[in-house]
Amino acid sequence: MPSDREKQRILRERRQAKMAKGGASDRLNKILSQGSSVKTSAVSVLDQPQPADHDPEGMDISTIASKPTPEPELDIDAMLNSVLGGNMGAGGAANGDPGSDPFTQMMMNMMQGGGPEGMLGQEGGTNPMSANMEYQQQLIAYNLYQQRKVRHRFLVVRMVSILANFVYHFLTISDFSFSPSANPFIRSIPPTSSVSSFFQIFVAIEAVLVAAYIAASRNVPSNNNGLLVKGISMAAMFVPKLQRFQPLIMKIIGCWDTVTFVLNDLGLVVLLFGLISFRR
């Protein structure tokens, strides 16, 4: 025999089955109308239409998906004007006149390579950067001029001194001891004291001129425009340790100038002896 709980469960299931079949509103009205002469038209919540009943069976997602908003195009000129002159005050580029902003004007001059107008405006102002570059170029040109002037002056002094020494001994020595020759007899003649004095005077002149040239070169600033120095400077951009060898290279270049100084003078002496070797 079923217990009370089972009876309640069976009744509850029957009630739910009847409500699921519909007619819940009629049953509710019948219950509410018992003992009353006025019939109400109450509607059960089970019979009320739900929002889900109006949903379509299938929907295209492209119709409900949010469309991407187009990105606004960037105005580069407006951005530059706002960055360069947006906070410059009433007299700057914020008023729509970038030419009246001194900072913007300076930037434009720098991008254009500098011109006669600078930070001081259009009334005879000069660009400090272009003026500095022009000064550096003039300084380099002046240093090159000083170096060439020193070299040319010493070249003239060297040639005059060597030629004077050679001509003097050539005219004062009457025999063939001062002339080179392939004749064994002439080559066997011992040199006289005059021939030895020529080389002594030559060595003395070279020593004096070399010392004077080194002293004069130190007073002229070097521009470091040699190919070797430029190569070291470019290589130091990738290998910074090479920069410490640049002073040593400058000293070697200075010593090489002195060596070529003496070698050129010796070459001139050899040339002069070769010219008089045709004398018989």
Swiss-Prot record:
Membrane topology field: Multi-pass membrane protein
One GO term describing the cellular component: Golgi membrane
Subcellular localization(s) per the UniProt record: Endoplasmic reticulum membrane; Golgi apparatus membrane
Residue ranges of the region described as Disordered: 15-59
Membrane-spanning residues: 150-170, 198-217, 258-278
Biological process (GO), any one: retrograde vesicle-mediated transport, Golgi to endoplasmic reticulum
Polar residues biased stretches: 31-43
PANTHER family tied to this protein: GOLGI TO ER TRAFFIC PROTEIN 2 (PTHR28263:SF1)
Family: Belongs to the GET2 family.
Subunit structure: Component of the Golgi to ER traffic (GET) complex, which is composed of GET1, GET2 and GET3. Within the complex, GET1 and GET2 form a heterotetramer which is stabilized by phosphatidylinositol binding and which binds to the GET3 homodimer.
Function text: Required for the post-translational delivery of tail-anchored (TA) proteins to the endoplasmic reticulum. Together with GET1, acts as a membrane receptor for soluble GET3, which recognizes and selectively binds the transmembrane domain of TA proteins in the cytosol. The GET complex cooperates with the HDEL receptor ERD2 to mediate the ATP-dependent retrieval of resident ER proteins that contain a C-terminal H-D-E-L retention signal from the Golgi to the ER.
Protein name: Golgi to ER traffic protein 2
Source organism (scientific name): Meyerozyma guilliermondii (strain ATCC 6260 / CBS 566 / DSM 6381 / JCM 1539 / NBRC 10279 / NRRL Y-324) (Yeast)
